[in-house]
């Protein structure tokens, strides 16, 4: 997608938002807490929402497990954004409003190496398996992509062989940043989280036969102080006009 096309999509979205949200009379501050899986499209879309509505969006990012635990333990916000499984869990716990739940975007797992490093064959599952056995260090997140990679390694029967190669993920540090710094030879994370990172070569997504797609969802907190504005934000993020912006970041609309 060209920058002109992206700008046009944002302009259209802003115009749509003006009509869609015209019924909201007073500007509010919306507190959002979430994991960074949707950060790339979210940060492109939110300014248009703020311009269209006058609302101010304040966002706090954290790891999937960290954010889910904080909300489960009583932390409040207006909107919570996490992988679908965590959102559904918090709804079951009575923390989030069920009928406010939306799927915002979805992403597969990508693979990256340090910029300039020798390319690795990830075109097939067998090629990727051989790569993991050959490299000295491996990094993956503590979120859904990392859980999946750990399971995949176990299914391949190479967990014992690569155990000493796994570099623990650092809190709130993207895997791409660790790879760029040379902390790991190869890294795995959501495509949308790898693409913005400088200092890495993005090799592409996992082969189709072993790919895992994570759906990122959001819902309004039951204790929200700006529930109506929060619902309006979710409507904006999931409007058809948002789709081109979401795709630009390597994700698909939810």
Task: Label each PLM-derived region with a short phrase.
Residues 7-8, 63:
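Hydrophobic alpha-helical segments, principally membrane-spanning helices and signal/leader peptides
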Residues 26-75, 81-107, 113-254:
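Exported/periplasmic ABC-transporter solute-binding proteins
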Residues 1-6:
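N-terminal secretory signal peptides that target proteins for export/translocation
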Residues 11-22:
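Bacterial N-terminal signal peptides
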């Amino acid at each position: 997608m060209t920058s002109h096309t992206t700008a046009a999509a944002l302009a259209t979205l802003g115009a749509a938002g003006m009509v869609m949200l015209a019924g909201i009379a007073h500007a509010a501050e919306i507190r959002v807490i979430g994991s960074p899986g949707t950060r790339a499209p979210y940060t492109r879309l939110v300014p248009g929402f703020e311009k269209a509505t006058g609302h101010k969006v304040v966002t706090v990012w954290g790891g999937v497990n960290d954010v889910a635990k904080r909300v489960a333990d009583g932390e409040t916000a207006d909107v919570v954004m996490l992988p679908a499984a965590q959102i559904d869990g918090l709804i079951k716990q009575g923390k989030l409003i069920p009928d406010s739940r939306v799927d915002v975007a979805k992403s597969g797992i990508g693979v990256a190496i340090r910029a300039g490093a020798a390319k690795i064959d990830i075109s097939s599952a067998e090629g990727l398996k051989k790569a993991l056995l050959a490299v000295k260090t491996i990094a993956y997140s503590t979120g859904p992509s990392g859980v999946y990679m750990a399971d995949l390694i176990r299914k391949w029967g190479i967990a014992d062989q690569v155990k000493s190669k796994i570099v623990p993920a650092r809190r709130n540090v993207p895997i791409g940043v660790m790879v760029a710094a040379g902390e790991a030879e190869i890294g795995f994370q959501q495509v949308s989280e790898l693409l913005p990172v400088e200092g890495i070569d993005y090799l592409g997504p996992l082969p189709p036969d072993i790919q895992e797609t994570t759906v990122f969802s959001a819902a309004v907190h039951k204790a929200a102080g700006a529930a109506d504005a929060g619902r309006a934000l979710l409507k904006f993020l999931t409007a058809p006009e948002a789709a081109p912006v979401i795709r630009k970041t390597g994700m698909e609309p939810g």
